[in-house]
Curated annotation (Swiss-Prot):
F-type ATPases have 2 components, F(1) - the catalytic core - and F(0) - the membrane proton channel. F(1) has five subunits: alpha(3), beta(3), gamma(1), delta(1), epsilon(1). F(0) has three main subunits: a(1), b(2) and c(10-14). The alpha and beta chains form an alternating ring which encloses part of the gamma chain. F(1) is attached to F(0) by a central stalk formed by the gamma and epsilon chains, while a peripheral stalk is formed by the delta and b chains. GO terms for cellular component: plasma membrane; proton-transporting ATP synthase complex. Belongs to the ATPase B chain family. It is found in: Cell membrane. Its main location: membrane. It comes from Dehalococcoides mccartyi (strain ATCC BAA-2266 / KCTC 15142 / 195) (Dehalococcoides ethenogenes (strain 195)). Pfam families: ATP-synt_B. NCBIfam families: ATP_synt_b (TIGR01144). Disulfide bonds: none annotated. This is ATP synthase subunit b.
Amino acid sequence: MEKLAELGINIPSFIAQVVNFGLLLGLLYLFAYKPILAKLDERSARIKESMERTDQVKEQAQRAEEEFKKKIGEASQQGQLVIERAVKTGDEIRQKAIEEARAEAEAMLSRARTEIRQERDEVVDQLRKEFAELTILAAGKVIDQSLDKKAHQALIDSVLENSTNLRKN
């Protein structure tokens, strides 16, 4: 102990300091260390909970994004179907308009042909009548007598019919 005294260490003072240090450690343990550890544990739990919530939010965001992409894909497909239907309907309407125009043109051509045929027949009949009258007049002048118009007309019609039949063949 003397050696400790030579070094300047006072034993009663040293013991008092060790006791004081032990008491201080005990008090700090009770009043500071436990509350600090409790606060740290609480903070750790909050951080862990926040991390879990963050993971959940990320998962929800990912699911929402996938659902959004899926809905966009479905909307795109529906849009394509609508476009295809519209194109098909447009083609059908165009085709129908073409067919109606074609039918109308054919009907107009048919009417025009019928009218032309009727007018031609009328002109031919009129020419026959005029030709017959001219023939009667000419024949009457040539023989200086007037023939029976009905008999002469029948003769001219017969000649004209024969000439028309010859032209058709």
